[in-house]
Amino acid sequence: MKTLLWLFSILFKKLILKRAFPILILSVLFSCNFSKKPKGENTIHIPKKSNILWLVTEDMGQYLPSFGDNTVLTPNLSRLANEGIRYPNVFSPSGVCAPSRAAIVTGMYPSSIGANHMRTTSYTEVTGLPKYEAVPPPEVKMFSELLRKQGYYCTNNAKNDYQFKAPVTGWDQNGKKAHWKNRAQGQPFFSIFNFNVTHESGLFEPYERAIAIPEDIEFRIPPYLPDTKTVRRDLWKMYNNIALMDQQIGKVLKELEDDGLLENTIVFFYSDHGGPLPRQKRLVYDSGIKVPMIIRFPNKIYAGTQDDQLISFVDFAPTVLALSGQVPPDYLQGQAFIGEKQIKRDYIHAASDRFDGFTDVIRAVRDSRFKYIRNYQTEQGYYLPVTYRERIPTMKELIKLRGEGSLNEVQSQWFREKKSKEELFDCLNDPHEINNLANQAEYQNKLIELRNEMDRWLTEINDQPNLPERDLINKLWENKLEKPKTTTPVVSITEGEITIECGTKGASIGYRIVNENASPSAPYQVYTVPFKIEKGNHLEIIAHRIGFEASNPIKYISKF
């Protein structure tokens, strides 16, 4: 209590005349209530087939009061954190959305399934390559399909961006109208709501969004960005977008509560990767891959606590499957971080490859304190003139100041003309990853440890960092000239039961029964076992292996 009173007095003296004062004081109140979750108590017992809700924002680092950044008040997320568990050590495997989302939905590292380049379905023409999709091993499914097989109603509202087209078996509903409200009564659900207001593009001018915070609010300016009017305006836009996102999340949470589902639902909040600013997005520094995550369990289990374990996005799929009562498939490269089957993670891994028309091959491994980075294109600097990023005013400002020679040593680092082959950072004492320790004698044991871990990981997931993208496409397409296509499914009837088969290994089969009472947009069901339909009903069938073209659809009319 004495510490809190002292902190309030300091803040009061410094900020009493600032409009930001009430926001900062309330933020401190929200962020001071966390305790560490007791070690060994990650086995959370909840009813099987609980509802699961994901609230996913874009391009946002840990810029929240509940994660120590008191710049802007986020009452809805602060409430969620106070009623749930805060996870401060969660990492995306890439500093951009599409590879990261591929990892989330498959439980596989992007560079192990051909999802590592940003993007596979666009910008390839800049490099003279065809559009393609990631092609995981045949046993790999979207984990939402596995939930559907267990009776879950699965919806995605509305961003996909998986580096492949989602099979019809992936979701019951997928689009701007997708919602748990559309399920059958009593059916458990897994629902995702995506919020793009915090996306990098939200920094572009003209900025015409609602104003949620004062423009003269105080900011933490990271040392790699200059303190200029332009940078401050972009920071204001970033935090204003976060405040707007919090309002949007509040509306979804209110719907959940109004429907009487809050205490029957596990609620996740996280960002799809780190921050939107230059030297954040697209990089494997913590600023690009470290994200906030909050999980609220029914009845506020472990409310207001913090879990410090290392978590990777590849761990999301096995964790949700475990929470739903399923045993996660062996092919998953991640591991459950909650439940009886959880395994302690010692390292997280990340990668960088092509971004739009530019390629920079980098791999990273991090433990709870140190990060090792391996640069494969040392003759190339870190900064890439990505056209999309050049639209951010701060990026234009950095380029202008670099030309004038006005950037200091730290701010100039990103514009180095060459890179060291290896980098080692103490992320605890150097959170912005400025000081490379790779050549310092006292850190050689740690360097060797993380170097060996990277080699182990690259071998385990069959990552080939030096593989040209053209050769990757040939590998995914098995040296054919065009994207492979799923073979047309075949229907057979035995004693009135319909059996559906597909000759493409790993293809998922979706079907829907169409009669005069059925909606023309009814979701495809996941085919698992033979079934019967009434005479005269129509059956529509599609087969689809991830990364392939979907099969030609077929229609069958029951005559039995």
Task: List each language-model region with its residue ranges.
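Short beta-strand-initiation
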Residues: I25, F358-D360, S420, E495, ...
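A structural signal for short secondary-structure junctions
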Residues: F415-K419, G503-T504
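Acidic glycine-/aspartate-rich tracts in secreted/extracellular proteins
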Residues: D59-M60, N429, N515-A518
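Formylglycine-dependent sulfatase
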Residues: C32-R416, P431-N452
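C-terminal substrate/ligand-recognition segments
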Residues: S420-I434, I461-N466
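Bacterial Sec-dependent N-terminal signal peptides
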Residues: M1-P47
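Short, compositionally stereotyped local motifs that mark structural "simplifiers"
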Residues: L4, K14, A438, N445-N452, ...
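Hydrophobic, well-ordered secondary-structure elements that form the walls
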Residues: V320, L424-D426, D430, L450, ...
